[in-house]
Every structure is written in structure tokens, then in C-alpha cells.
Amino acid sequence: MLRTVVAVLVALFAVQARAQMTGSATLLSDYRFRGASLSDDRPAAQLAFDYDWAASGLYAGGMMSSARLDSRHAVQALIYAGYAHRVRPDFSWETGLRYTRFSGHEAYAYAEAYAGFAFRQLVGRLYYAPSYFHAGYPAWYAELNDSHALSGKWYAFAHAGYLRRGGDVMEYHASRFRSDFRVGIGLDLAPYNVQLSWTTTRGASDAVFGYPSAAGTTRNAWVLSISYAW
Amino acid sequence: MRHTWVIATALCTLGLCVAIHAETQQPSQVLVMLRAAPPHLRAADDYAITYASSPDEAARKRIARELAHQYGLQLVDSWPMPALGVDCFVMRIVSGTSASDIAQALSHDTRVESAQPRQTFHTLAKDDPLYALQPTAKRWHIAELHALTTGKNVAIAEVDSGVDASQPDLDGQIAEQRNFVDDSGYRAELHGTEVAGIIVAREGNGVGIVGVAPQARLLALRACWQLADGSAASACDSFTLAKALQYALEKHVQIINLSLTGPNDRLLQRLLDAALAGHVTVVGAVDDTTADGGFPASYPGVLAVAGEHADVQRSDVWLAPAEDIPTTQPGARWNMVNGSSFAAAEVSGLVALLQELSPDLTLTQLHDALHARSALGFASMRPMTIDACAAVAQVSHRCTCDCGTTRASLGVPRR
């Protein structure tokens, strides 16, 4: 996997001559992915980079994050590439592919396609994974994100997501749906960004969706994060 | 009296000279536009930095610093222009190279979307207080028009120098004030306050004047600065004007009033294109000292307005009263003003009256309403004086002012 990541990084650096590159390093009190903790309710560190070829609308990027799966430490590698098109100054759409895998937990590797729109601060996306967390069944995820500038450098944000899996769920005696919500405030102290949010999930448990989270992780959490962008 | 005339003339001449000097000076800064990618998914989207307004801004700032270093420039300022999908960076020229040469070189750099010199503009007030009082409201029958429409809730962006919102005739009439000139506080100035009074001065308050559209929502966007105390002469530049236009677009105003002029400017042209594409009516004052009327009045789609006695040859120019206009000044003061700046302000107010009557009024319908036609129905080949009553009657389909006069203007036989 390391070779794949290095190859992708080399390729991106090779074509970055005319791209706009952004990087960020983030520390979080809990790594929540669609409401599920991928860090076993513990702190995590992330390193992300993004490339934009603004003239063409193409973009690509990746992230490495510490994780804790099945009660064991791991490193997540995530890469993505897509195309975005601005229709009007306040409206654009995008489509792309994203691929995720975890060191020492190759069985959880999966890919998903997505399409979405952005209208002013409102962002909506629909994701489709043929085999969500490599569990052998497809899953759809829809999300809406919004943010609102408050006074000075403060802002508020909110997220709502809805996950639906395919396949048989009889063995779990549970529904195939789950929703997650997140609300919070942020402080933009460029290049630093601090966020405090509260996240919760409703519906089926982590196990129904094949999440590699440890047993006993909570459904609700306060998450504090600080990121540095360059 | 003679003494006052001499002093006023001297002040006026001094003010205009300062403005003209500022405009003819070689630009010492360039504006460099870098493309901003449309919003899209990012690596940490679900986790930490989703909601930052523009996470890739740091990348463009880094490229701007690289460009400044490479071309021997000094990075001064920047401003996002989402209406054009770019960030605009201001760079000062520290070598002796001309701004146009550097802008041309930058334009060929693949990292750069476009580049241009930072140009200077000036307002079009003649600032002569010695003409006899002659209320212009009488010529447009403002009181009678207000029985039908007052421009209620129509948003007008006045891109100008600062407006005194505490002036008794403007108290409560200014929806928002923003300063795009510098980081200091908003400042009340002559030209901006004079133009604002003509558009929205409070009606029936027992003092001063009546604005053409007293119930319109005026956004007082300070993009110009007064050059000397006591003189309305003001200067602006490409960057301050672009910031104000960008803000007006963000606020979805219906009308933009530009009582100013200067050279053709690519960045401002693109912002005007965005405004016109969004069905915003842009009103520009004609500079009758230039053959084409000056920019932005000369730009296609802009309602170009000149004074009734101006010597203009273009047939697509509208004429409105521009002499002896009583209006507001900072503090509890009023004075008579002259210049196409104020004719443009009157037309902006009139457009607000029409847009209250017909919010979906297209630019073509607006032109038809304003454009007086000959008795045979042919469009005029000369600049024509606006008949406000006829325009309101055409849009409202109702009798207004003197019905006979209105019908005559519309080409309908008088009974």
C-alpha cells in the first residue's frame, strides 16, 4: 500500500507545476466518519493535501489519518479525484471517485463514486459504494452541509447525512438505514482553524454497515479539532 | 457675492485638477487575477475543515507571492471575486517598468487568469453651488409618481464616496454602509451624500428634498474617496470599484449606480457582464468631455445618462436634469449641485420606481419605457430626454401625472 501512496504522491507532484496545492494538518479529539468513530473514541491526527487545476475544473487529493480499527492501531490512506464545474457564481456541481484503505486491515479497502452540488454555502452530495468497507453489499450515502458566518472570525456549521445499505440485514434484526447529524462552531484564525462540534447518529448500529469500529464506541460525541493549512 | 464665486470656482478647479492629475498619473500597481476552483470535495471533508469558506485560498496566496517575487513586485492586498471565479491580488511595481508592460507579461503566465494596471476613476460632479434654485422634482412630477410607486424594497447599490447616513434627509434611508477604500472606518463625504440624497432622501419629513425613490433600499458602498475638504471631487480605482461591484452582486441588488468615469477596464467590464447577465440594471454617468462618454457609461448594456444640456452625439444616451439639483450634504446641509453624476442618480431612482411596479422588468422593456419615440413610433436617432411620467405610465399601464401629456409621449392621440 505504501508503494501505491508514494506513486500517487510522486505523480501528483510531477503534475503540480500549474496546480494550486493546499495542505493541512489536523488534530482531532475523535475521528468521526459519518457518525461512526474510526479512532475508537480517541484522538487522531490527519495530514491532507489537495490539488486544483482551476482552469480545467479537475482536482485530486489525498489524506493520511491515524485510526484504530478492531481495537488495533492503523493508518488510513484516502485518495480522490474529480471534476467540478461552476455553472453560476453561486452554483456549481461536481463528480468524482474516492478510494480508501487501512494499513494492516486491507479487508476494509473500498471505493465509492460521488456527485454533488454547491449552492452558496449549502453543499449536497450523493455517494455510492459497490462494497461499503469491502463488506460485500452496496451502500448509498446522502449528505447536506451548510455553514453560516457569525460575527468576526466565528462561523457555525451543520451536517446531516443519511446512509442506506443493500443486501440482507435479517441477521442483525435491524433496519438498513442510519442517519448522522453534526452541529458546531468554528473559529477561522488563518492559517489555523478551530472547531467544536457535537455529533450523533440514529438508526442501525455500526456493525450493520460493516464499520471497523471497536465494540462499545459511542453514538454521540463532542469533537474538538484544530487544523493548520498551508 | 463676487468674492464667493471666485472662491467657489477656485475650489472647484482645484478639486477637478486633483482628480484629473490622479487619473493621468501612470498606474503604479497591477491587479493580478488567479483562478479559484469551484467548491468541491476535499480530503478532510467529513472531518475537520469542511466549512472553512475557501480552503484553497492559501494556495493562491502562495502563488501570488511567487509571482510577486518573480516579477519584482510587492504584494499589497487581495480580495475574492466569486462573481468571476477569481481572487484579485494587488501588486505594487517597485522597479521602473510600466504597469501595462508588467500586466502584459503576467497575462502570459499560465498561473495567471488575467492581469491589468490598477486604473484611476473620478466622479462627475461639477460642484458649483452658485446656480439659482430650481427643483428638478417638478420636471418629473415626483409627487404624482409617488402616488403609484416609491421604489419600495428595490435594492440599489450606490458605488461612490461615503454617504452621511445621519443627514436628516437620509436618516433611516441607508440600508447598509461598506468601506472598500481602506481598512479605516466608513467616512461621510460630499459626492456620495449628494448622490444618495437624490435617490432616497426621505419624503414628507419637513426638511430638505424628496428622493426619486425614497423607499428603495440603498447600499452605500464607499469605493471612492474625496480628494479635498469642501470639494466633491473624488477618485476611485479598479480595485476599490471591483470590490464594491463584487459585493453588490453578492447582495443581489437590482440596480447599480455608477456616477463616475475613467478608462476602459477589463476587470470592471467582466463584473459588469456578470451584473448584466444577472438582470441587474447598471446606470452610468456620461463624461461629456470624452468622445465615447467614458467608461462605464460607454459599455454595452449600461444605461448611459447625461445632463439635458450635455453635448453628446450617441443615440443610446438618456438625458436627465443635471443642473441646479438640490440635494443633501454631510451634516444637516443641503446645496445645489450640477453634473451628470446626479442625472445618473435620478435615473437609478426612476428605474427603482419602475422595478417596484414590474419586478420582472427586462432590460429591453426598461429601454422601451425610457426610450421616447417619435410620433411614427420610430426610435430616436439622437439622445432623448427621459419622460418619467411616460415611463411609469408605460410600465404601470395606468394614468399618471397629466394623462394628456403622458399619452402624447407614448404616441397615443390626445383626446
Model-identified regions with their sequence ranges:
Chain A
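Short glycine/proline- and aromatic-enriched beta-strand/turn motifs that initiate or cap beta-hairpins
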Residues: 19-68
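Transmembrane beta-strands of outer-membrane beta-barrel proteins
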Residues: 21-25, 58-62, 79, 93-95, ...
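Residues on the lipid-exposed face of transmembrane beta-strands in outer-membrane beta-barrel proteins
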Residues: 25-29, 47-51, 81-83, 97, ...
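Outer-membrane beta-barrel pore domains and translocons
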Residues: 26-30, 63-67, 84, 98-102, ...
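Residues that define the transmembrane beta-barrel architecture of outer-membrane proteins
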Residues: 41-45, 73-77, 91, 107-113, ...
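Outer-membrane beta-barrel channels and translocator barrels
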Residues: 54-56, 86-90, 119-122, 149-153, ...
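Detector for outer-membrane/organellar transmembrane beta-barrel domains
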Residues: 110-173, 198
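Outer-membrane beta-barrel "beta-signal"
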Residues: 120, 183-193, 198-200, 216-230
